[in-house]
Curated annotation (Swiss-Prot):
NCBIfam families: rRNA maturation RNase YbeY (TIGR00043). It comes from Enterobacter sp. (strain 638). This is Endoribonuclease YbeY. Its cofactor is Zn(2+). It is an enzyme of class 3 (hydrolase). It holds the Pfam family YbeY. Coiled coil: none annotated.
Length: 155
C-alpha cells in the first residue's frame, strides 16, 4: 500500500481556521500514491512575509505567492522517500478564493494538488506541459468531489 507521510508546519501568526491535518493528508493521498509508493512531504503554511521572502529569494518575484514547491534531490546513489516541501501562503490562498469565488477548502485542495504535482516533476511553463498538468489537477479535484479549478478560464 502506498504511504504518504505528512510533516505539517503551521507558521502563521494566527493558525485558527486553517484546514485540519487530516484534510492536508487526504489531498496528498489523492495525488502522490499514483506516482510513487512511499513519500514524505512537508507542508508549511506561512504568512505573507515569509512567502514574499522565499518567492523573492528563489524565484526573483517581489511579492507573496500562493504555493512554492521545493523538490528534494537526493545525492546520487542514495534513495530516500523525501519528495520535498510545499510552502503555502494562507493570505494569498484566502484572497484568491474570494476573488475567484471558489470555496476556500477547494482552493486549499487545489494548491496542495498543484504543488504536489510540481514536486513530482510536472510544470506549466510550456503550453503542452500546462495542459497535461491542468488536466491531472482537474481529474484529481473532480475525484475528490470538487469542481474543475480551471472552469472560469474555460468559459
Amino acid at each position: 500500500m502506498s504511504q504518504v507521510i505528512l510533516d505539517l508546519q503551521l507558521a502563521c501568526e494566527d493558525n485558527s481556521g486553517l484546514p485540519e491535518e487530516s484534510q492536508f493528508q487526504k489531498w496528498l493521498d489523492a495525488v502522490i500514491p499514483q506516482f510513487q509508493e512511499e513519500s514524505e512531504v512537508t507542508i508549511r503554511v506561512v504568512d505573507e512575509a515569509e512567502s514574499h521572502e522565499l518567492n523573492l529569494t528563489y524565484r526573483g518575484k517581489d511579492k507573496p505567492t500562493n504555493v512554492l514547491s521545493f523538490p528534494f534531490e537526493a545525492p546520487p546513489g542514495i534513495e530516500l522517500p523525501l519528495l520535498g516541501d510545499l510552502i503555502i501562503c494562507r493570505q494569498v490562498v484566502e484572497q484568491e478564493a474570494k476573488e475567484q469565488q471558489k470555496p476556500l477548502d477547494a482552493h486549499w485542495a487545489h494548491m496542495v494538488i498543484h504543488g504536489s504535482l510540481h514536486l513530482l516533476g510536472y510544470d506549466h511553463i510550456e503550453d503542452e506541459e500546462a495542459e497535461e498538468m491542468e488536466s491531472l489537477e482537474t481529474e484529481i479535484m473532480l475525484a475528490l468531489g470538487y469542481e474543475d479549478p480551471y472552469i472560469a478560464e474555460k468559459e
